[in-house]
């Protein structure tokens, strides 16, 4: 099993100048052996709209730094760790530009980028309104996501022909394939709805699933993905399964035994990588680096 790291990108980062903070965290994570470094991709959110943000009485919104710019900055200061958004809602940027951005990150990082995408969560409606972005219904967003995935695969093929979708049209998908990974940067899809699970089975190289939900719910979702894979005649084992663990793992100078038990249970469900949040205090980070990573790397993943 692997350990990934999520770092925050909000205006609550106050310890030091942003660039210095990112360099320090990224270089530490790269040396420590974290498998992947992921960042959230939002522009601004009201903390009351989602349980994933801490409430701050001084700021009515959590303003985010632009995710792909941050990843490019981090790529220049790291050598090994994989890089991704977790994830980019396809309604936030024009899709062909998003694919080219991921291609460029893959080239800059010498083959360490994912194209991390999702259908844009419901709690992002207010964020879209503030940025002047349309926010279609949930069903349309999922349909748009599938079209974006089809577009990405055609762009990566280098085939010179138009892309004619219901929502997006390109005159030609010819272009120099700048990316390093072959056949293309891996697709990471995050979500949990039934329509999203079908897209995961059909298009994803990696999935992020769970988001703080219980083990029983996660087991059910994974079985649905497995069923879709069987229907598509695609090996379920081709897909890397990841989840974001929201709770603190370090407690009073020790790893929380309950957290470790939960991570072991994730591995029994077939989760290949658990993403943890970057802790605020250096001692907790050191504990993750020196104790959590080697412990988790020795946990076998069911089905592997």
What is each model feature region?
Residues 1-304:
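Active-site-adjacent structural elements that line small-molecule/cofactor binding pockets in enzymes
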